[in-house]
């Protein structure tokens, strides 16, 4: 069903913001963490880097995910008012925001272990910190796939319409 320009622009914006979010997140796992693992020589340096990275990331990335979901929600609502199905857009939104429960359920133990070590860096073992950061980077790479899949689903719907 043909849609007006504002709905098409909103759909495209949702796909772009979701893709941007995914790329930003993936960059942390495949660029940032490997670089810091190659250059830091002390556990305290690694822990400081992680906590700063986490602080910046948790302020910015959830808001991008919510914004993307709101854009998909607007698109779903607009599509329904013109007689179309908003379900594909809702599925894209839910897929995108699924990164949040993944964080709470899967990543929290690793995050918490790193935060505990940061609270007492003198007692932190370099090998253990490195192992946890590698684990975090792997989990974070998986988490970055949620907004990417949401973008793929959103783009697929744009191409269908």
Swiss-Prot record:
<comment type="similarity">
    <text>Belongs to the anthrone oxygenase family.</text>
</comment>
<comment type="function">
    <text>Anthrone oxygenase; part of the gene cluster that mediates the biosynthesis of trypacidin, a mycotoxin with antiprotozoal activity and that plays a role in the infection process. The pathway begins with the synthesis of atrochrysone thioester by the polyketide synthase (PKS) tpcC. The atrochrysone carboxyl ACP thioesterase tpcB then breaks the thioester bond and releases the atrochrysone carboxylic acid from tpcC. The decarboxylase tpcK converts atrochrysone carboxylic acid to atrochrysone which is further reduced into emodin anthrone.</text>
</comment>
<feature type="transmembrane region" description="Helical">
    <location>
        <begin position="15"/>
        <end position="35"/>
    </location>
</feature>
<feature type="transmembrane region" description="Helical">
    <location>
        <begin position="136"/>
        <end position="155"/>
    </location>
</feature>
<dbReference type="InterPro" id="IPR013901">
    <property type="entry name" value="Anthrone_oxy"/>
</dbReference>
<keyword id="KW-0472">Membrane</keyword>
<dbReference type="GO" id="GO:0004497">
    <property type="term" value="F:monooxygenase activity"/>
</dbReference>
<keyword id="KW-0503">Monooxygenase</keyword>
<keyword id="KW-0812">Transmembrane</keyword>
<feature type="transmembrane region" description="Helical">
    <location>
        <begin position="56"/>
        <end position="74"/>
    </location>
</feature>
<dbReference type="GO" id="GO:0016020">
    <property type="term" value="C:membrane"/>
</dbReference>
<keyword id="KW-0560">Oxidoreductase</keyword>
<protein>
    <recommendedName>
        <fullName>Anthrone oxygenase tpcL</fullName>
        <ecNumber>1.10.3.-</ecNumber>
    </recommendedName>
</protein>
<comment type="pathway">
    <text>Secondary metabolite biosynthesis.</text>
</comment>
<dbReference type="Pfam" id="PF08592">
    <property type="entry name" value="Anthrone_oxy"/>
</dbReference>
<keyword id="KW-0325">Glycoprotein</keyword>
<keyword id="KW-1133">Transmembrane helix</keyword>
<dbReference type="GO" id="GO:0044550">
    <property type="term" value="P:secondary metabolite biosynthetic process"/>
</dbReference>
<feature type="glycosylation site" description="N-linked (GlcNAc...) asparagine">
    <location>
        <position position="4"/>
    </location>
</feature>
<feature type="transmembrane region" description="Helical">
    <location>
        <begin position="87"/>
        <end position="107"/>
    </location>
</feature>
């Amino acid at each position: 069903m043909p849609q007006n320009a504002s709905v098409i622009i909103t759909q495209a914006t949702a796909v772009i913001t979701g893709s941007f979010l995914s790329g930003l997140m993936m960059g942390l796992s495949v660029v940032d963490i490997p670089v810091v693992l190659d250059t830091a020589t002390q556990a305290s340096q690694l822990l400081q880097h992680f906590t700063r990275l986490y602080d910046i990331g948790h302020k910015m990335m959830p808001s991008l995910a919510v914004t993307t979901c709101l854009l998909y929600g607007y698109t779903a609502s607009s599509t329904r008012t013109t007689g179309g199905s908003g379900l594909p857009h809702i599925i894209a939104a839910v897929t995108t925001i699924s990164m949040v429960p993944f964080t709470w359920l899967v990543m929290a133990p690793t995050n918490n272990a790193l935060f505990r070590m940061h609270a007492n860096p003198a007692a932190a073992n370099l090998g253990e910190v490195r192992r946890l950061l590698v684990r975090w980077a792997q989990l974070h790479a998986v988490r970055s796939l949620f907004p990417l899949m949401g973008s793929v689903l959103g783009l697929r719907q744009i191409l269908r319409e």
